[in-house]
Amino acid sequence: MKRAFFTIILAAVALVGASAQTAVERLSDPSLRLIKSDVWSLDTLQLDSLYDYWNDYVLAHPKNEQAWRNLFEISNERSVRFGGNMEGARAYKQQKNVVGRMEEAIPDSYTFNYCAYESYYPKKVGEPYDWAAYARVHNQYAERAIELLPDDAQAHDYETWASYLITQKTGQDTTQLTDLLTRYFESGYYPAEALQYHFNELQGMDEGAIYIGHTEGDIYGKLILQLVLGVHRDKIFYCENSAHYRPYIEAVFQQAGLSMDFFEPDSAWARAEEQEEEYRLIIRYICEHSTRPVYTSANCINNLIFDKGLPNDLKACFYNEGLTMHYSAKPYDNQAVKRRNVEERYRLEYLRLSFMPNDYSKDSRRFKQPNDLLAFNYLLLLNDLMPYYKAHSPQRHAWLNSLFTDVFDQIMRNNVSGYGFGGNMFHINVVTEGGLHYEVVQEPYLIENPEDDEATRQRKRDEQKAKTRVIIKTEPETHPSPSLRGRE
């Protein structure tokens, strides 16, 4: 199904009553295609029961690729439950030998090559585990799987191979990645709302910018826009999740025109003892030595460098310009830039349309953000413009207030009353006093220890209360939207 750029697909969603089926019964349907989110929440007993079911199924139907894939997803998740016991996980995989048996049953199939790539499987059936031997053929599985990728591939598969190509082939011919992302885009699996959000992020960046992303989820949409839809092709993307692979970092540096002296044997990066320090040095070097403007997303500031965030001195040099943060060693009027982005660059009217609800029972993307949460980001990041517009541009203030109200309407229609992230809960309240409007209350998480005495618990509650505050407050509209009118 091909999809036009920035089209929001409206769908009627029927609410279905909860089934009395158990999870194991539901996931034992022979017609079912399991995705990773189906098995994440299962306990070990449920996983073992499902393993037995699907193992019996592939024994009876040895050529059924979907059944083998289901068995692999279950066994792979079960091996993860060994936690830090790597030997136990390895012994489990060797005992079950799912991928080895798969190679005998469906050799050189897409399913086998995908599973072999994802499972650290040695080349020969029965061969003892040997990381060096596996590493030599690892990429062969990926390349062959990409060649065999079926038309009904899941979003997770598209993103798995996009991540592989980003890491392995940045700076090289982009034909393979472009073809893959074109198929992903045309599949309809990548949400239009997410694509619009990435577009607006790019719209706010100056020409030739470098964008620093935390995970591939921060750049998939931008790459679709760039390689498939042909917009913002001047931007360069650095994904920290791929920075473990030195050729990838070198390719990004070459694209950005940064000195390769960074990689010299006596450099600070080469001498770094911890990967965390390597990542910190990479970002610092990009920011401080690039002649190109450098940006990141607001959520990445605290998630980069293994979720520890940027160092405080570097963080202080990033200025909010709307959806993105811009690095500058010198202070400047970033609020003026944010106003320019809102008034001239961002396309915001799509936020008034009905969001297509995320159906996580079918969404197999590796990196997910609900469409309504993306919309909520606009409110958090643009709300500080409201006082300026109220004082200097009443018409613009009324427009932005109306836009905010419509976003809240959409969120409330999805029965969402708030979000939790960044150590805080954000509660959305409908307020009738003074006229119908919305408020967002930011409340820090209350973390209590069972060993806390009553005085400690009370102190924590007092601290939480002191930090709880209203951070967004819309104003009543002259003609309230239908959602608000229904709450009178």
Give names to the regions the model predicted.
Residues 16-20:
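Sec/Tat signal peptide C-region and signal peptidase I cleavage site
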Residues 481-483:
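Serine residues within intrinsically disordered or low-complexity segments
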Residues 1-4:
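Positively charged n-region of N-terminal signal peptides that target proteins for export
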Residues 7-14:
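Bacterial N-terminal signal peptides
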Residues 21-207, 220, 225-471:
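ER/secretory pathway lumenal C-terminal domains and tails of membrane proteins involved
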Residues 485-488:
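A cross-taxon signal for low-complexity, glycine/charged-rich
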Residues 212-216, 241:
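Short His-Asn-centered micro-motif
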